[in-house]
Amino acid sequence: MSNLPFTVAALYCFAPLPQYESLREPLAQLCCANGIKGTLLLAAEGINGTVAGSAGAIEKLIAHITAIPGLGEPELKYSHASEMPFHRMKVRLKREIVTMGVEGIDPLKSVGTYIAPKDWNALIADENTVVVDTRNDYEYAIGTFEGAIDPQTRTFREFPEWVKQNRDRLEGKKIAMFCTGGIRCEKATAFVKGLGFDDVYHLKGGILKYLEEVPREQSVWNGECFVFDERVAVGHGLAESDVELCRACRRPLTPQDKLSQFFEEGVSCAGCYAERTPEDRARYAERQKQVKLAEKRGANKHIGS
């Protein structure tokens, strides 16, 4: 049991929800009434999101979600935070609960073989296994599994094209995929199986479940795991890390990254300096000045973020 005051729940469930629009308002009201913040996505294919609040509030929300007709038990990962990691609550209606942009992909019909965290090391140690990180390049940059391929994608929409262009690296291999919490791999493995590959596997519960269950001394994970909230990243045991966000481009920054000559808090980092004009950086510098003034007044320190 954690002593940290906020419970963070990452959840998803693929299930037919033809009336998903009607679920939005009750969910939003429940979250607002119980001080829950974060994001929930609803689509005809299911629900996905990460939220935070008191343990009791999150328990109420999960009970509400589980009781939605036709939904069933969501895939859940719990962690904890010292501060509220979200600024507001959003319940959004979407075409997909995780956007791949490929028509006809249905994880309920065909998906890879789930591998429990305790069995993951053995699978990826097999010399006939190719390990694929389905996340984005900025996530890979701060942590991944030993020997994992980086597809160098900026968004998940780019992943299908990477697979098509790299079929020769996958042919005749066991294909082991992983992502943060498991949802991207539901679609990634379904897509790859649809291309005719048979030996397709994915880490059940994703990196978060692995870091929670596998002891550090047995782990083959290197670095930190990027998360899409103000914690930025977590490590073994889902402990909060010292990774921060560049407030100009929202890339994750390690303490080493902040030593770069191109790093200026709130203005630029080595990753985005060349992508921005001097006018952009001047604007960001003014925003950062306002952030610091707001901090002195005790106001929101994340102006414009």
UniProtKB/Swiss-Prot annotation:
One of its GO terms (biological process) is tRNA modification. Residues 125-219 form the Rhodanese domain. Its EC number is 1.14.-.-. One of its GO terms (molecular function) is oxidoreductase activity, acting on paired donors, with incorporation or reduction of molecular oxygen. Catalyzes oxygen-dependent 5-hydroxyuridine (ho5U) modification at position 34 in tRNAs. Belongs to the TrhO family. This is tRNA uridine(34) hydroxylase.
